[in-house]
Structures are given as structure tokens and as C-alpha cells.
Amino acid sequence: MKNTLFALGLTAVSATVAADPKSCSSLLDLDVRRLAGDETVNLCEAYQGQVILIVNTASKCGFTPQYEGLEALYRKYRDRGFVVLGFPSNDFANQDPGSEEEIQKFCRLTYSVEFPMFEKVGVKKGRAAPLFERLAAAGAPYPKWNFYKYLIDRNGNLVDHYISTTGPESAKVVKAIEKLLSFQDSK
């Protein structure tokens, strides 16, 4: 009887630890630099417990207007624990050739971007930044173009990914975000 109770107690503790959004996911446990600045942020420490949409961005792409939809999602859901994290990249057809300062200015002036933006990075296989290497190791493809999106749950697990043609305000993306937010809201 004691062994059974001990095993049940151990199982309950293990389940609690596994579901604890405060524990750091290896996917997000890395430091990145804010766009056009010197401040370094540990993604796990800064965003653990939140639903995250990671996006590789570009300023001169046919999909660049998606900044508007990304910002709209961020503003709509941020108070419920949702954040968009943008990572500019010049890996595709030289569509983000500017300096980080130019990219930051473009995002703010053209699309009023308030969601966190980080350093310009490589995203292609073989030269991808550590975050994109980890996303690939978690089962997502490397971006094949600008504005690939990666949805991460509150525990830091990759839930889904979306190609460039799937807009941030598409029913598919919104439904997935709302499901993750509602799951936590119902606890």
C-alpha cells in the first residue's frame, strides 16, 4: 500500500513538473540580441509561460505586409499571454539588405511594429541561427522563404509551423493560437 501511494505521489509530482510553464524549454533556452541594440535576452526567461509565434521577417518581400497582421495578432492577444518574436533575415533574394537600424525604423514607421524584434539572423540550413536550428531539430522545416511562422506553446514546445503563404490572421493560425490560449485560460 505504501509503495502504491508513493508511486501515485511521484506520478503526480512528475505530471506537475512536466506541465509547469515556468520550467525552461531547451528550445527557448538561448540568448538573442534585440534588434539594433546591445541588450541580450534569454528567450526562456523573457517569454516562458507565453504562447509564442516566431517569424523570420524581411522588409522588401511580397509578404512584408504580413507585419500588419502580426502586429494585429500581438495587440489582440498579448494581454492573454501571447507574443510575436520577429527575426529579420536576408537569406532570400536579398530582401532585407538594410542595417538593423534601418530595419527597425522601417518596421516602426511603416507598420507600427511593437512586438519584439531581434537581431538579423541566418535561417537557411547550414547557416541558421541557433533558434532556427532548434526549431528544425524539433521537427519543423527550415524556412524556405520569408515569413515562415512557428507556434510554440506555453511550455516551450513546438506546436505547428506555417509557410509564408499562410497569413498571420488566417483562420488556421488564429484558431491554433486561441486554442493554446484557451487551454491555459481554462486552468
What does each model-found stretch correspond to?
Residues 1-4:
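Positively charged n-region of N-terminal signal peptides that target proteins for export
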